[in-house]
Amino acid sequence: RLGLEIGMHNSPGFSVTGGPWIDPAHAMQKVVWTKRAVPGGAVLKGAALERPWACLGHYRDIAVLAVPDGAAVAAGDILDLTSRVRDGALDWRAPAGRNWTVYRFGHTPTGQRTHPVPDEIRKTCLETDKLSREATELHIREGLEPLRKRLGRHWGRTFTHITVDS
């Protein structure tokens, strides 16, 4: 009637932050790792690789790599041992002639909460993983679709934009 248009950030807090619908698997992630020294020629059979630290109880493996010790290492000398690991245990014979460091890489949530948001929801709101298609689709489905339904005919007319800035 007045020709006004309105928009908003897409969730409580700063733009593209998330909400209570974001679980640790869909929250912002960071890479974590542990390492283990292995002498050249050593035979590892079911050797436990320490699991990296997990925030909020969520952790997923990315890769297990063996890097020969030395000041300069050629990329071709790094060995991918991921397929030799089962349930965190490694089966591998380290090539003789040099010592190795085995790295177990994974990812876990950063634990970052949305902000600024009302105190009553802050502890339940994790920031979404902006690099994950699945997490972004979850955020749209759970955070924006209810708004679209509630606004009805005003969606796209009076309510004309949502800011996404991350």
Regions found by a protein language model. Give the residues of each.
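Mature extracytoplasmic enzyme cores
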Residues: 1-166
